[in-house]
């Protein structure tokens, strides 16, 4: 959807779950959160919220005021998400486009803030899902560190972005199995292993069958979210929603 008003076409055709980006369409069209939700108020499916990305960084070790401000914004986002009845809010543990000047200190700062946010989320009865973000030297956590994050913080859950994991060369099926019941959602999209293209499933170089097998092995409930580029035709999105359902039911 290139424009926010185009979502009516989707809402008319889709009654399943939705993930709402708080940065707006294309991540660059600021919206009034309270006004914007009115268009989704009557939607029958479950709602998940993707909290803002830009200008926020829970891991800022050089400037504590940035990480503290980011915490306050995300706390407000959790409260808003709970207010509209969302079941889950997705958060990035760091600003993935920012170089890590002090990696260990940045990890500690992010973990401390995620612990605080997890406590808020628990009180609000909303799932706080932490996504794997950042590529190569810009990634705050590697694969093993990402798994340990959820061992250290019991009040958060894991969202595995399959496309991000592919670019970083992670063992995505193994990661899914290692996380087990701590996995609450997956972002499904494809790429060429180099750029974060958000292509439809099958449009890149990801080997999907091992991922489907790993997801089918999970016995708990989790969200399967198509996170395709905004210019993907609605017909493709709906077709692939059915494809995912078929694959996971095999």
Task: Identify the function of each model-found stretch.
Residues 37-54, 111-121, 149-153, 208-213:
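Alpha-helix-loop-beta-strand connector modules within alpha/beta enzyme cores
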């Amino acid at each position: 959807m290139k424009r926010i008003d185009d979502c009516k076409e989707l809402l008319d055709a889709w009654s399943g779950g939705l993930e709402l980006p708080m940065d707006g369409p294309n991540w660059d069209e600021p919206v009034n959160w309270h006004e914007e939700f009115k268009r989704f108020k009557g939607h029958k499916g479950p709602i998940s919220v993707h909290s803002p990305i830009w200008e926020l960084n829970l891991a800022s070790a050089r400037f504590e005021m940035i990480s503290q401000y980011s915490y306050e914004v995300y706390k407000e986002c959790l409260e808003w998400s709970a207010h509209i009845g969302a079941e889950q809010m997705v958060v990035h543990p760091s600003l993935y486009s920012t170089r890590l000047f002090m990696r260990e200190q940045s990890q500690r700062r992010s973990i401390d803030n995620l612990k605080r946010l997890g406590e808020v989320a628990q009180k609000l009865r909303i799932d706080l899902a932490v996504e794997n973000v950042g590529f190569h030297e810009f990634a705050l956590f590697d694969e093993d560190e990402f798994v340990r994050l959820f061992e250290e913080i019991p009040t958060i859950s894991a969202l595995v972005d399959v496309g991000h994991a592919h670019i970083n060369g992670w063992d995505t099926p193994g990661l899914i199995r290692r996380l087990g019941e701590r996995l609450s959602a997956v972002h499904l999209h494809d790429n060429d292993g180099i750029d974060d293209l958000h292509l439809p499933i099958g449009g890149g170089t990801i080997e999907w069958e091992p991922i489907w097998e790993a997801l089918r092995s999970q016995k708990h409930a989790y969200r399967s979210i198509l996170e395709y580029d905004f210019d993907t035709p609605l017909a493709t999105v709906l077709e692939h929603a059915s494809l995912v359902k078929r694959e996971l039911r095999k």
